[in-house]
Design a protein with these regions (language model features):
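Cross-kingdom Sec-pathway N-terminal secretion signals
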Residues: 21-33, 39, 92
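Serine endopeptidase catalytic core focused on the charge-relay Asp
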Residues: 43-158
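Active-site region of chymotrypsin-like
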Residues: 32-45, 59, 116-123, 146-235
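Generic low-complexity segments that are intrinsically disordered, proline-rich and/or Lys/Arg-biased
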Residues: 15, 25, 31, 223, ...
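Hydrophobic alpha-helical membrane segments, chiefly transmembrane helices and signal peptide h-regions
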Residues: 12-19, 51, 106, 196, ...
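Secretory targeting and sorting signals
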Residues: 1-28
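Second-shell loop/turn segments in exported
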Residues: 94, 119-130, 165-166, 235, ...
C-alpha cells in the first residue's frame, strides 16, 4: 500500500496542489511524535526539523541535512524517509545577494508517527502567505536544536534567501530549523528554513521560494524516470502525473 502525501506547503499557491506518493517508509516506533524544531538525524547528519503537515504526513528540513538511511529522531526511532531534496549551497565560495540558494528536503513520514505542528515553546507553526519576508527590519525568530529560540530582524532580502541579525543566533545542528514571524493571535507563521551562516550572518531560504522550487522540481521530472516516487500536480483545470526520481 502506498501513502499519499498532500504537501500543505502548496497551500501558498491556491491554483495548484501537489502530492507525493511514495512507498511507505519503515514503520516508526509507536509513540514517536514529530514536531517542528525537533532534532532529526539521517546517517551521521544532525539537523532540525523545520515544518510538519499533519494532513499531508509530510515534513521539511534543509536539503543539505540528507544522509544515509531513514530519518530518525535523536533516540534513533525512525520517523520517515527523505523523498525529495534540492541543495545548491555553495561550499567555500563567496556568496553575493543575486546568488540563488536552494536548500530543502521533503520527508515522507512513517505511518505510525504522531504529528504535532507545535514548536517546543508552545506556538503552533502555520503557513500564512501574508507573513512572507519582504523587507529588512522585519521581525523574525528562529528555532534550532542547539541554540533554541532566538529572535531578531531581517538584515537583507536576497534571491530566494535572507540574512538575519540583531539577536538571531545559530550553531551547527540548527540547519533546517524553522524561521518564523509571530502573529497577533499567538501563533508562528513560517517564513523560511535555516540554511547556514554567510559573512557572519545567520541565513535562511525563503519558504515561498522553497515552495516554488519544489513545484518546479516535481514538474520537470520525466514520467519514464519513475522509480518509486510518484508526483501528481493538480491544477484547477488539469491534472498532470509525473515520475520523480528518489535522491541518490
Amino acid at each position: 500500500m502506498r501513502a499519499r502525501l498532500f504537501l500543505g506547503l502548496m497551500a501558498a499557491a491556491p491554483a495548484a496542489a501537489m502530492a507525493l506518493a511514495v512507498a511507505p517508509a519503515a514503520a516508526a516506533d509507536p509513540g514517536v511524535t514529530v514536531y517542528p524544531g525537533m532534532e532529526i538525524r539521517q546517517g551521521s547528519t544532525l539537523c532540525t526539523l523545520g515544518f510538519v503537515d499533519p494532513e499531508a504526513r509530510a515534513a521539511f528540513t534543509a536539503g543539505h541535512c540528507r544522509g544515509d538511511g531513514p530519518v530518525t529522531d535523536k533516540a534513533g526511532h525512525v520517523i520517515g524517509a527523505m523523498a525529495l531534496f534540492d541543495d545548491n549551497t555553495p561550499d567555500g565560495a563567496t556568496v553575493t545577494g543575486d546568488h540563488q540558494i536552494a536548500d530543502w528536503g521533503a520527508i515522507a513520514l512513517a505511518d505510525d508517527v504522531q504529528i504535532n505542528p507545535v514548536l517546543p515553546g508552545g506556538r503552533a507553526l502555520v503557513i500564512d502567505e501574508a507573513q512572507a519576508v519582504s523587507r529588512p527590519g522585519q521581525q523574525v525568530c528562529h528555532f534550532g536544536v542547539v541554540t533554541g529560540e532566538s529572535c531578531g530582524t531581517v538584515a537583507a532580502v536576497n534571491n530566494g534567501w535572507f540574512t538575519m541579525g540583531n539577536g538571531v543566533v545559530s550553531q551547527k545542528g540548527d540547519s533546517g530549523g524553522p524561521v518564523y514571524t509571530l502573529t497577533p493571535d499567538g501563533r508562528a507563521a513560517i517564513v523560511g528554513l535555516f540554511n547556514s551562516t554567510w559573512g557572519g550572518a545567520p541565513t535562511a531560504v525563503s519558504w515561498q521560494s522553497t515552495g516554488q522550487r519544489i513545484r518546479e522540481a516535481v514538474a520537470t521530472q520525466p514520467a519514464s524516470s519513475n522509480t518509486g516516487i510518484e508526483a501528481a500536480i493538480s491544477f484547477t483545470s488539469e491534472s498532470v502525473d509525473a515520475g520523480v526520481n528518489p535522491p541518490a
